[in-house]
Amino acid sequence: MGVNIRHNKDRKVWRKEPKSQDIYLRLLVKLYRFLARRTNSTFNQVVLKRLFLSRTNWPPLSLSRMIRKMKLPGQENKTPVVVGTITDDVRVQEVPKLKVCALHVTSRACSRILKAGGKILTFDQLALDSPKGRGTGLLSGPRKGREVYRHFGKAPRTPHSHTKPYVRSKGRKFERARGRWASRGYKN
């Protein structure tokens, strides 16, 4: 008898183009595909690769995180580049003067950056401004910041597991009994 060979894991899948049919995104892909081919800069290759990613891999970047990253030694006077969204953070009192480049900036973050005397560039403007990515710093938001990641990992209710269980409701009758959790009397 023959052996059934599973071919489902044979191929490593990576994107060669974005799944999205958004024409503006596809125009950016055309531009950065040209730049990645014609320049010897890895910056353009990384931007192109990030433009292909799925939306869950384009996590939003908060204003506070961006400011913190741009204060690091060697990052002063650089343009933060975000393939994704920049969102506002109410915990930040003062926004420094920043020149930023992103696919999308929320209205409140936009007004705060501009009010501080900053500037917001689109990726086509960045390509004219700095075709090789000189004087830029690539940033991205936390990919594991989504709530769903709290449910991943070691099974809930096992020792040393901090994984969040999927519970239908947070009511009195749902997984709150003695013997269910170590904190409820004992754990069976």
From Swiss-Prot:
Modified residues (Phosphoserine): 130
Oligomeric form and interacting partners: Component of the large ribosomal subunit.
Region (Disordered), start-end ranges: 150-188
Bias kind Basic residues: ranges: 151-171, 179-188
Function: Component of the large ribosomal subunit. The ribosome is a large ribonucleoprotein complex responsible for the synthesis of proteins in the cell.
Name this protein carries in UniProt: Large ribosomal subunit protein eL18
Keywords per UniProt: Cytoplasm, Endoplasmic reticulum, Isopeptide bond, Phosphoprotein, Ribonucleoprotein, Ribosomal protein, Ubl conjugation
Cross-link (Glycyl lysine isopeptide (Lys-Gly) (interchain with G-Cter in SUMO2)): 119, 164
One of the GO BP terms on file: translation
Sites bearing Phosphothreonine, chain numbering: 158
Gene Ontology molecular function, alphabetical: RNA binding; structural constituent of ribosome
Gene Ontology cellular component terms for the protein in this record: cytosolic large ribosomal subunit; rough endoplasmic reticulum
Top-level taxon in the UniProt lineage: Eukaryota
